[in-house]
């Protein structure tokens, strides 16, 4: 399906529940690159690149998150692939 980029804004109880570390682990398992970070409004932002099918798997996972998380909503923005990332990192 081709290389793409997706930006996610994950809302709910998603900070202090290992959401970033779990997202990094899942993204690496899927072979994705990019980053994940906490936002000041209590949400988590994810920017990921890779094959569209794997990005869709990450989106599905983000709607559940790790067991301690309570995801209320995931806003998804598809973008063009940039190739700017070489791994998947936790920022901030």
From Swiss-Prot:
Enzymatic reactions: an acyl phosphate + H2O = a carboxylate + phosphate + H(+)
Ranges where the Acylphosphatase-like domain occurs: 5-92
Keyword Metal-binding in record: no
Active site residues according to the UniProt entry: 20, 38
The keyword Ligase belongs to this UniProt entry's keyword annotation: no
Gene3D superfamilies: 3.30.70.100
EC number: 3.6.1.7
NCBIfam families given in the database record: PRK14426.1
Protein name, per record: Acylphosphatase
């Amino acid at each position: 399906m081709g290389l793409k980029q997706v930006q996610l804004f994950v809302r709910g109880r998603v900070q202090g529940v290992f959401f970033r570390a779990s997202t990094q682990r899942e993204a690496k398992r899927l072979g994705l690159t990019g980053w994940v970070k906490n936002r000041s409004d209590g949400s988590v932002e994810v920017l990921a690149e890779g094959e569209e099918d794997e990005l869709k798997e990450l989106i599905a996972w983000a709607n559940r998150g790790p067991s301690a998380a309570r995801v209320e909503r995931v806003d998804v923005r598809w973008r063009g692939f940039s190739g700017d990332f070489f791994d998947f990192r936790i920022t901030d």
